[in-house]
């Protein structure tokens, strides 16, 4: 970043030479008062401190008015940074961050706090304590970010949220709209709903962690490459408590409606009913790429109701389950008409199945260079149906493409249902005999799949 301090020093020196005394000595008159001079001076101011507007970080005083005054002052000056120093700031209402304004706390990276594990409560740094809106998801978000507005370096903690289920509903913590708003380097410790992105483009959520209880992040009407990077949802606040179980049965880590060219890099969620959910809203559905998108201990790591024709592309992801028999890594619903593709991903359990595909006739699901492990014999399935559904991947609708993958368990690998439109299963390696079951009415290509002998037999033959 360019340093302008030396310029300011020289400028001050020249202004001193041009003082009224010097001008008079040179036979020059000072210019008349400029009515716009005050406005220009205000524009040169780039930083405001909330303490100068009456904010008190004692954990009890309502700071809604003081913060909004500081934010509005920055907005009136056409942008700048509003600083919230160390303190625990309580709020009874909502904040609106105007265009081109940054609300900046003390943290340089997302902090970490826990109540049930380490009793490390959010007592230091810049901590926001919202209290308004309890009892309903409706209503204004706690922090509203307009075009080019930024929230950075804070911890948001709801002090009145209870540890017993069900949790108290609140509106979203952050609403992002317009172009290029951002949430950076922050912790959303225990919101009911975390971040909502809508009606704009180039939104940026980077280096954000926490434990949203109901919905972590919701994206819809994002028309120009919304970006998520290093977003990490983990139950720091209530791990292994009844409320944590409520979250597992009811929560969703990420929800994507209409988002054009979505980018998601190194995202993670743990302990949700659904990790990544893709839906079709009135505005449309999603397409984009998800690299390093991981989900663990979810009933469905990825659930696709529908996606856009141009595909949702997963690469280098890991999907793990610990709660059979309800759980599975991937479920594609019967309304999906788009393409869902996984490359270089790992799926492991224990689980009843890794993937259940029920797509529309024009839907497509593809796996390439993936690893599958730890799917059992589907104990909850009716006995007469187990042969159809107990394979690792059950493909019932749309088309399926499975190439270059590894299946590590000695159980059936793939079932191809009668309503499939097309299937290619080729060049895969199985750590047991090849067991691909088909009831397809259409032609399928199933070839060049290698079944390995049991590992213990291989060791025995080597010893002989």
Segments and roles (model prediction):
Residues 418-460:
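Leucine-rich solenoid repeat scaffolds
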Residues 85, 98, 104-106, 152, ...:
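Feature marks extracellular polysaccharide-active and adherence modules
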Residues 79, 92-94, 112-115, 134, ...:
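Short glycine/acidic-rich loop motifs that flank beta-strands on beta-rich extracellular proteins
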């Amino acid at each position: 970043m360019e340093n302008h301090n030396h310029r300011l020093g020289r400028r001050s020196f020249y202004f001193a030479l041009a003082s009224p005394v010097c001008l008079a000595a040179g036979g020059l008159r000072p210019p008349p008062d400029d009515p716009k001079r005050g406005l220009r001076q205000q524009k040169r101011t780039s930083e405001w401190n909330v303490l100068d507007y009456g904010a008190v970080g004692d954990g009890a005083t309502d700071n809604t008015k003081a913060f909004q005054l500081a934010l509005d002052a920055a907005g009136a000056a056409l942008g700048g940074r509003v600083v919230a120093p160390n303190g625990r700031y309580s709020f009874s209402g909502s904040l609106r961050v105007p265009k081109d304004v940054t609300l900046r706390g003390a943290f340089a990276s997302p902090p970490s706090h826990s109540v049930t594990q380490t009793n490390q409560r959010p007592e230091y740094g810049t901590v926001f304590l919202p209290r308004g809106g309890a009892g309903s998801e409706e209503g204004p978000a706690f922090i509203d970010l307009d075009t080019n507005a930024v929230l950075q370096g804070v911890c948001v903690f709801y002090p009145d949220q209870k540890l017993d289920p069900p949790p108290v509903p609140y509106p979203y913590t952050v609403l992002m709209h317009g172009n290029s708003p951002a949430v950076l380097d922050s912790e959303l410790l225990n919101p009911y709903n975390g971040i909502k992105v809508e009606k704009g483009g180039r939104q940026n959520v980077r280096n954000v962690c926490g434990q949203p209880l109901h919905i972590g992040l919701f994206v819809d009407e994002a028309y120009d490459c919304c970006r998520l990077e290093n977003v990490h949802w983990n139950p720091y606040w209530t791990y292994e408590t009844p409320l944590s179980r409520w979250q597992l049965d009811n929560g969703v880590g990420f929800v994507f409606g209409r988002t054009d060219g979505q980018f998601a890099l190194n995202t993670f969620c743990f302990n949700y009913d659904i990790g990544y959910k893709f839906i079709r809203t009135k505005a449309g559905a999603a397409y984009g790429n998800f690299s390093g998108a991981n989900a663990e201990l979810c009933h469905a790591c990825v659930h696709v109701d529908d996606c856009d024709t141009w595909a949702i592309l997963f690469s280098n992801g890991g999907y793990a389950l610990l709660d059979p028999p309800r759980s599975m890594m991937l479920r594609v619903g019967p309304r999906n008409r788009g393409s869902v593709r996984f490359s270089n991903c790992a799926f492991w359990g224990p689980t009843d199945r890794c993937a259940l595909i029920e797509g529309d006739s024009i839907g497509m699901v593809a796996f390439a260079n993936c690893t599958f492990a730890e799917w059992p014999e589907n104990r909850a399935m009716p006995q007469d149906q187990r042969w159809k559904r107990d394979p690792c991947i059950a493909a019932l609708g749309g088309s399926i493409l499975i190439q270059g993958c590894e299946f590590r368990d000695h159980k059936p690998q793939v079932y191809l249902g009668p309503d499939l439109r097309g299937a290619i299963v080729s060049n895969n390696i199985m750590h047991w005999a090849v067991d691909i079951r088909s009831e397809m009415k259409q032609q399928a290509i199933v070839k060049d799949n290698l079944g390995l002998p049991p590992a213990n037999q291989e060791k025995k033959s080597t010893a002989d």
